[in-house]
């Protein structure tokens, strides 16, 4: 064994002092512990799981989902809640907008009987509740809907015409400073839903911005933009929207990946439509003209008919889904794989 240099001895002494003062594990060499795969919660969309690069929403991170009104922000978040619950996780929904549709959430697969819901009166109250849930170490995913509805107490108690410049931005900045370290220890996925506003006087460039200041942009490990693309029609009836999702920021994989899926009214993300598109892209499902085929057998003429075939034949749907997941390197998540150690974070 090589003799330690003065520099090595000095760093070992410093590390020893740090561990005695702040606890074991407060500092270590990165190579001293095995690098583990990032634990995730599926987004509910195979295409988005692939675009995120790690197989879903990472645990122990802050995530922002933003976009125009009625673009599918809450729907995407509720799909993630349903996936977390399927893995045996506990989910919480901070309904700052007081607009959670329980019947719709159930249709998306959310177990509403087990969902923790809070409808806070002020932004401070909402973020304190989030902090307490995170520190419990028992909650797997928390949705805050939305940042724009986190109104500071001073604004609620003040008069209608009063100016409250920067109050919400300061509130978000302070909360995120507290929350970021804690969620890393408890492996809680914290998703903020945000709205879009327009900057005044912008001539060049994009005038759009999100509410709540810049803190969330910095602290978020993943930022997702969601927008309507085109309407999905059956004759004159609009059944849903083709929706475009872009990963604007990603600290865990290359960003700027874009995907599209069908967002159907009353149903959420169309699993059949998404699987059909991915199956064709991967060569698992054959497309010739308007006809779709699988294993040499025709499954439908036109996209809508092929989607209906998948709905009527779940065994074929499951076969194709298994092949797509295998091709993507995505295993079916289980509580054991993605489970986290339950324990209280240090106050």
Curated annotation (Swiss-Prot):
Subcellular location: Cytoplasm
Molecular function terms, GO-annotated: ATP binding; ATP hydrolysis activity; ATP-dependent DNA damage sensor activity; damaged DNA binding; single-stranded DNA binding
Keyword field: ATP-binding, Cytoplasm, DNA damage, DNA recombination, DNA repair, DNA-binding, Nucleotide-binding, SOS response
GO biological process: DNA recombination; DNA repair; SOS response
Top-level taxon of origin: Bacteria
GO cellular component: cytosol
Record field: compositional bias (Basic and acidic residues): 337-347
Region (Disordered) location: 327-347
Cited InterPro entries: AAA+_ATPase, DNA_recomb/repair_RecA, DNA_recomb/repair_RecA_CS, P-loop_NTPase, RecA-like_C, RecA-like_N, RecA_ATP-bd, RecA_C_sf
The keyword Metal-binding appears for this protein: no
Protein residues bound to ATP: 67-74
Key word ATP-binding present: yes
Family: Belongs to the RecA family.
Stated role: Can catalyze the hydrolysis of ATP in the presence of single-stranded DNA, the ATP-dependent uptake of single-stranded DNA by duplex DNA, and the ATP-dependent hybridization of homologous single-stranded DNAs. It interacts with LexA causing its activation and leading to its autocatalytic cleavage.
HAMAP family associated with the record: RecA
Protein's name in the database: Protein RecA
Lineage of origin: Bacteria, Pseudomonadati, Thermodesulfobacteriota, Desulfobacteria, Desulfobacterales
């Amino acid at each position: 064994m090589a003799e330690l240099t003065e520099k090595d001895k000095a760093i070992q002494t410093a590390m020893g002092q740090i561990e005695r003062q702040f606890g074991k594990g407060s500092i270590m060499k990165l190579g001293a512990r095995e690098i583990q795969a990032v634990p995730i919660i599926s987004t509910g969309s195979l295409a988005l799981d692939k675009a995120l690069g790690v197989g879903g929403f990472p645990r122990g991170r802050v995530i922002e989902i933003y976009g125009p009104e009625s673009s599918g922000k809450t729907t995407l978040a509720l799909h993630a809640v349903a996936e977390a619950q399927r893995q045996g996780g506990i989910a919480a929904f901070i309904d700052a907008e007081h607009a959670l549709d329980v019947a719709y959430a159930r249709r998306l697969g959310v177990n509403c009987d087990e969902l923790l819901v809070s409808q806070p009166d002020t932004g401070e109250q909402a973020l304190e509740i989030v902090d307490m849930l995170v520190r419990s170490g028992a909650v797997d995913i928390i949705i805050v809907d939305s940042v724009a509805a986190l109104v500071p107490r001073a604004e609620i108690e003040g008069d209608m015409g009063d100016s409250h410049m920067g109050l919400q931005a300061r509130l978000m900045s302070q909360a995120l400073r507290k929350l970021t370290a804690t969620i890393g220890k408890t492996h809680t996925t914290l998703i903020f839903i945000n709205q879009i506003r327009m900057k005044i006087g912008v001539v060049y460039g994009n005038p759009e911005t999100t509410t709540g200041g810049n803190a969330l942009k910095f602290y978020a490990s993943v930022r997702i933009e969601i927008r309507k693309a085109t309407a999905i029609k059956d004759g004159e009836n609009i059944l849903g929207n083709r929706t475009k999702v872009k990963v604007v920021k990603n600290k865990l994989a290359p960003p700027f990946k874009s995907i599209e899926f069908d967002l159907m009214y009353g149903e959420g993300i169309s699993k059949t439509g998404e699987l059909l598109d991915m199956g064709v892209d991967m060569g698992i499902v054959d497309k010739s003209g308007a006809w779709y085929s699988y294993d040499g057998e025709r499954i439908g003429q036109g996209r809508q008919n092929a989607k209906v075939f998948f709905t009527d034949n779940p065994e074929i749907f499951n076969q194709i889904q298994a092949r797509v997941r295998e091709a993507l390197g995505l295993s079916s998540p289980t509580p054991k794989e993605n489970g986290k150690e339950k324990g209280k974070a240090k106050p």
